[in-house]
Amino acid sequence: MVRPNNNQLPENLPQLQNLIKRDPESYSDEFHIQYQHFLSLLEVFALNPSEENKSLDDIVMFVAQVAQCYPAVCEEFPKRLSDLLKNYATVLDPAMRNCFVKALILLRNKNLVPALDILELFFQLLRCPDKNLRTFLQTHIVTDIKNMNAKHKDMKLNSSLQAFMYSMLKDANPKAAKMSADIMIELYKKNIWNDSKTVNVIATVGCFSKVTKVLVTSLKFFLGHDEEDEEEDTDSENEVDLKGALMANRVNKKTKKRTKQLAQIKKQAVKAQKKKKNAPAFNFSGIHLVHNPQGMAEGLFKQLQATNERFEVKLMHLDVISRLIGIHDLFLFGFYPYITRFLQPHQRQVTRVLQFAAQASHELVPGDIIEPILKTIANNFITERNSSDVMAIGLNATREICMRCPLAMGEDLLQDLAMYKTYKEKSVMMAARSLITLYREQLPALLHKKDRGRQTEAQAERKVRAYGEREVHDTVLGAEALLKDSKTIDIESEDDTDSNDGEWVNVAHSDGEGGGADDDEEDEDEDEDDDDEDEDEENSNDEENEDEDNSDEGVESGEESAKAKKEKKDMRILNQKEAAQELALTRIFTDEDFKRINAANLKKTVTSARKRPLEQDRAEFVKLNSIEMIYKKRKHDKESRLETVQAGRQDRERFGWKDGRVNEHCSKTNREKRKTKNFGMLRHKARSKVKKSFKDKQQALRKHLLHQKKMK
């Protein structure tokens, strides 16, 4: 029997493909034959596109593989495939459709097809009822756009694609719209389309889509915290245990497989170490980039009131609206009465509803708007007919709301809630005390006098702000702590530098500095100096013949006093607050300076304030506060714990095996020596023990027992 020849080029396309890639010119005729064959098969296939054609499948992939060798001949090849997909996208056989898509991707990877044309076609193919194809296209679209923006962002292409995406989100096909939203969100998370245009397309179209899946996907994008938590969990689970792998490799038997596994674990450990050292890349939250947050919040609230979606979708609406209100300080007064309806202990997901109420609170919301929420929580949660957990949740929610809007709390309600500080259940008691602590810092006047506590310096410095008032700092808080070491600013009272009440410092200036008031004072000083000099001259003329030595000494002392007065004119007396402002303007703070500033600010929070202000001159007495300063006991860190452990080991015997010999320099027994011997020295004896017969073992045991008996 004659074997068939498998190397015939017209029928063996893989062999012809290999030869063409090596030498395109020599096999151009064969390629032309195959291309004409492709055109004829394509015309036949167009008559019945729903039928699979294996010959066309093979020849399409063949032409796509070698198209770069004959660009002039294959110029119309991508267009023919694109037209076929556009005209018969939903009718084509799934296998043939996948074949054409893969061929176009192959041509796109070789830069034989414009990116915009091919991506627009692929977005249209998302309407096809083929899940595998849609997933494949999504992966390719994201990868292709990522590669195009790898070196620098192609703004023109991105703008065109985003405009096309805008229309795709409005598509009537829910699957295409959902896939388009997924692609945009994935590109945003990969920092490719992380601009405001992408965010606002999702905000204006996705969040108001009639398709529930698109709506939920868009709302999750603006919430977007669960996925980050999941990534952190997976990272912690997949952490490489290099130390354990090294120990296992040392103990276990050495094999090639285990050696390869150890090398792979080492590579993973090095990679993880580099990843930890690299600066983390943060995704800027999309909710900050919304152009019209007020309009978006109002639209979502209107949609929420009219929707009949599941309760989970309503919770997403509430979450996004509350975040918009809290982040952008919006006014949406109808939101608060709406959310009050859900504030019942038996309400499903009531803790999340309380969270949304706190998120929607900010300082610019009038207290009269939020006060009904606090009263509802107090009436429904903070009552003794409920369990202690419900009461504690209500108090905690009240604290979170008041933390963002302190003026919403009334004096009577606050004092009633403060009475739970002595409640029998610890959870309720601690929650009430946390609320008291909050108002000790914010508005202590609302508390009962016995609940206000001893005022600290930080509380004394804090000004009670009215509605809508902003706290503006004109210097770095705590910069007074750096005045003592300042070279340009001289503190007159070096004995007491802990407080900023009435302390005065001298600030050195150059000759050209100073205001008009200082110039007037300098002029007056100069006039007085001139008068003094005239009087000195007259006196010196009268007494010139009497004592020449005294006149010389007077001239010298006059020169010294003039220098001292000139230096004094260059000094300007400031209080400590003004000196801190001067220091912030004339000095660049280092990390050590900021550490000292933070320590000084922390010190103010634990230092009791004075009942009356200190006097201006502070050199006459020592501050009582500097003696009675109380610091919180800090938790021991690892270094301090190790120091304590080492100190306890100094006068203690070491744990472990003890040498029972009276003289440590005398010889050891054979049994003790055997423990430290190399196994090679004991191998022969161990082998002889294994080979012993039962009778030999009996004799050896009898001999050993007799020897032990004699030793007694």
From Swiss-Prot:
Q: Where is the composition biased (Basic residues)?
A: 671-692, 700-712
Please list where the region (Disordered) is annotated.
Answer: 488-573, 662-712
User: Which intervals carry biased composition (Basic and acidic residues)?
Assistant: 560-572
Q: Which UniProt keywords apply?
A: Nucleus, Phosphoprotein, Protein transport, Ribosome biogenesis, Transport
- Where, subcellularly, is it found? Nucleus, Nucleolus
Pfam families noted in UniProt: SDA1_C, SDA1_dom, SDA1_HEAT
* SUPFAM superfamilies registered for this protein in UniProt: ARM repeat
Q: Where is the composition biased (Acidic residues)?
A: 491-501, 516-559
Q: Which residues carry this modification: Phosphothreonine?
A: T234
Regarding protein family, the annotation reads: Belongs to the SDA1 family.
Q: What does this protein do?
A: Required for 60S pre-ribosomal subunits export to the cytoplasm.
Name of the molecule in the record: Protein SDA1 homolog
- What is the organism field in this record? Drosophila melanogaster
The lineage is: Eukaryota, Metazoa, Ecdysozoa, Arthropoda, Hexapoda
From the UniProt record, report the name of the gene that encodes this protein: Mys45A
